[in-house]
Amino acid sequence: MPSFDVVSEANMIEVKNAIEQSNKEISTRFDFKGSDARVEQKERELTLFADDDFKLGQVKDVLINKLAKRNVDVRFLDYGKVEKIGGDKVKQIVTVKKGVTGDLAKKIVRLVKDSKIKVQASIQGDAVRVTGTKRDDLQSVIAMLRKEVTDTPLDFNNFRD
């Protein structure tokens, strides 16, 4: 029986490349001259450092621009609150989301069942497996999910016949 998995995962290699490009641009930009603005990464956690709130916004804009150029969806980013770290310096922790959350998985399963397409959807960890008898049914489910779920970027992989 044909099947595929619905997942939500950012390409961490491209995220790392975007961070390196952001740091390079920040170090050469005139408006950041003499400031301690930078982006650091620890696994799925990014930390933005800047001298004040305005420069933090500029660092965030540079990072978003570089991520977009590398085809990483910015909806993967979950922004924490801005913290003061001594003097005027500020930092913000940004988490890169991974996996389909429980609520989203239930929503996907409900959408698939309500669509009356002859397929079955089951939650498997941080992915949703959709199986059906016809490949055309699976392709119509993919089209329907792309149209209905807009708040989280979805990937469809592990397509088996």
From Swiss-Prot:
MF terms in GO: nucleotide binding
Record InterPro entries: DUF520 (IPR007551), UPF0234_N (IPR035570), YajQ-like_sf (IPR036183)
Name this protein carries in UniProt: Nucleotide-binding protein Bamb_2603
Alphabetical list of Pfam families matching this protein: DUF520 (PF04461)
Gene3D superfamilies, alphabetized: YajQ-like, domain 2 (3.30.70.990)
HAMAP family linked to this entry: YajQ
Keywords (A to Z) from UniProt: Nucleotide-binding
Function comment: Nucleotide-binding protein.
A single cellular component GO annotation: cytosol
Family (UniProt): Belongs to the YajQ family.
